[in-house]
């Protein structure tokens, strides 16, 4: 209701207002007020009433000769926001309808269903993208007629960038410990076995999931588990705290309770258990020693070798860091331009900053995919757009253009025809062009000229553009260069010099090249020759790595010398046009001769006098942002990397009349550079690079490893399923067509870069440690054995350890028995040798991870399936289908039997019946060592940061006028 009352008040005020300045003031205030309104919070009825009032006010302002373009654009933006909200509501309703419907609709059904709605989301997406990217992609703000293909919308889950830093004491041991009693066998068949002294063992619960996740192969299981473990490992190579307690057996010493040691000490301190006396004797020497001078700590632990290996990996492959002090000094030097930067506090010697982790893998992926490269460049442009200082324009150019017309004495009869000469000159074009020029200094782009190409204003603007823009072939396409030259010739030179208009044809595409020696005015010819030199821009800062950032370029125009070639060329060209028009009774197609000559004199003064502030403004911005070139986001030129990929560059739109608008529109010096904002931006880029590198390299490493283990797996599908996009650029990888992504992951250079990443090395080291843990830990109880021995005749059960009564586990492979591996048998290798051993009734050993079927004592004692398979292993292990194909078709299970129940006496009948032909090969159980392992780690507070600016205090010390680094003022009135 407040909005409606405000608009009613403004409408009444307009009725009483008569002065044009007051109308303009009301218009500007209304634009600001409309910008502060949130259209999504207003009801439909109230919004319709507000629209009516706005339209009435706009009509009144137009009647008062006030240009209302900005107000109408703002109102259109608000309407589009409401349209997008309605579209989202319609799409949600559609999803509910589709969920209720059993049949799945096709894409065409969706399109037809949506098209019947009052608001079509496909067209709405176009409008929304136009709204969001208009300033970034430099879409023509005047013309509504353009097409844009929008694929089917996808929701992208982009998580905020957070960097979690964990120290070593946060590590949770993966291998638990347990206390288990020894079984003492009875020599008397009438007496049951008894329990002996207990022992502390390492458990193997860590491999509980091995049967459910190793169906595709044990190697894939190791890689998947290594990837999960990498996320759980600490990423800082030091301790910041340690859980200590007094040694209960020696009050002068301390014991470490971290890393799961508290559980061990609780077990050992059971004084009723005399079997642990040796452990208690060793425990009294456990101690924690802190060296405050060297900042280290030594302590005792009893951990499984696998846990110790993971600790070493986490310390060796901790996240790379850099010293904070040099970076703070660099920031202080950068901000010395107009600011005084001081450290807030003294920095500790161990104060660290996360290193600049720039992913060469991501850079290579951008080189292989044009859409991904452009997406990343657009994202970088969007990030950098907030850094520019371009608040140098007046609110409107209408008064300026009116003065030019008045000075040219244009009669009111021909005002319509003349108005078209400068009708495209406006502030929107100037801002768009200035943004384009600033971005072209850091990014290499292709130009796309838009707007009218047949007016006097566009021709004057093209004449200036040929002086400012880089016209060399590497930076400007021949087509764009020809269009600019032909426009200047046809609209300015041909009419003024009374020459025929140039028409493009095969072999003659450039008017300047065609007529440079055709006897034109000498001043005009000099300008044409200077343009045909096709001069590039000057390099201002060289990039350290062209695969990451392109060189920073600036226009090749002098900042102080008015006799520079560019200024002289423009001045002489306009003098030549004026001179030629003196002898010509009809020097322009729409403007009378006298008016044209006076108009050209005014334009000469404007172009020559106001070009230098434009060049200084560009240099003022580029000089300062270029100083942090090595901290900026990705801005590489794909043409530098591969000369065949010029078409993959981003194409930016520049209004044809933008350069004249820019020259006429600058009226003041820009705002001062806020170095606090610029250096905070550098911190944000460092965090973004870190998050992108982690996300890309982790998922790519898993994809390569899984493909190495099984060539049938798709690297592309694994990568897409594993990647967690931290930025829209990473999320855009999911939109790359399937075949293109497959081709990218076939690139040998990309794969080699992935293999050389920090993530790949960590995951590979963890997988190797997992393989060693599997080989040396008992895993038969979890359903997987190291191998099996198949006998032709049933044998007595053995006893693999002192913790069981009997079992069919062997800890060593018997000598003198033929061995086969499962992989060979599945490939059909040596299968005939296996059959020969079976026919000869010889025992065989099958090596490799073998799935097990666990049986209990009751099943063995009765004639059950377990009894039969354990006593006829050949028939159970070899299937008739294997004989047809002469290879092992699938992994076959074998029986595992463990009897740990001593609560009954031995029975002769049991001993006769309970025999087996299958023995499982496994590793022995690991006993927790009595004497501890001594660990030594750095020990200090967490002094790692991802932000430098929070350690710096900014104090403004600005000069009265804004200057370039060489002392020149940006703008002089």
Curated annotation (Swiss-Prot):
Cellular component aspect of the GO annotation: T=2 icosahedral viral capsid; viral inner capsid; viral nucleocapsid
Compartments in which it is found: Virion
InterPro entries named among the record's database cross-references: Rotavirus_VP2
Keyword tags: Capsid protein, Inner capsid protein, RNA-binding, T=2 icosahedral capsid protein, Virion
Domain of life of the organism encoding this protein: Viruses
Keyword Transferase: no
GO molecular function: RNA binding
Chief subcellular location: virion
Function noted in UniProt: Inner capsid protein that self-assembles to form an icosahedral capsid with a T=2 symmetry, which consists of 120 copies of VP2, with channels at each of its five-fold vertices. This capsid constitutes the innermost concentric layer of the viral mature particle. It encapsidates the polymerase VP1, the capping enzyme VP3 and the genomic dsRNA, thereby defining the core.
Subunit structure comment from the entry: Homodecamer; each decamer is made up of two conformers of VP2, called VP2A and VP2B. Interacts with a VP1-VP3 complex. Interacts with the intermediate capsid protein VP6. Interacts with NSP5. Interacts (via N-terminus) with NSP2.
The family this protein is said to belong to: Belongs to the rotavirus VP2 family.
Name the record gives this protein: Inner capsid protein VP2
